[in-house]
Amino acid sequence: MILLNKEQIKYLHSKMIQETGGSNGIRDEGLLDSALSAPFQSFGGMELYPSMIRKGARLCCGLIKNHAFFDGKKRIGIYAMLVFLELNGMEIECSEEELIALGLGIASGEIEEKDVGIWIVTHNRGE
């Protein structure tokens, strides 16, 4: 499994902000660390998020809800999820409007983490 580390997420966020606008920078390093480590947590020797889909959903929701960045939290949550899934063999096929709706829904609480997992499954065109 290929993971995204903190420096890679910071780079993706910076690049995304340059291309789409907004304020660059991290508001809280601890919240970023939490969002990046959560998908890989275990308890009693069992992974809390055992599948690639659940890890991707947790990464996305953590980056959006933790408010680690000054701006672009919805964009980086979605972007990081897509990159993570692609690096690990999943190909997500969807429209820009669907991505926007997903990010807004997660941020507002209308879409929960389990729903993100379902979204990933229904939009996966990879192997």
Kindly give the residue locations of the regions a language model identified.
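FIC/Doc superfamily catalytic core
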Residues: M1-E127
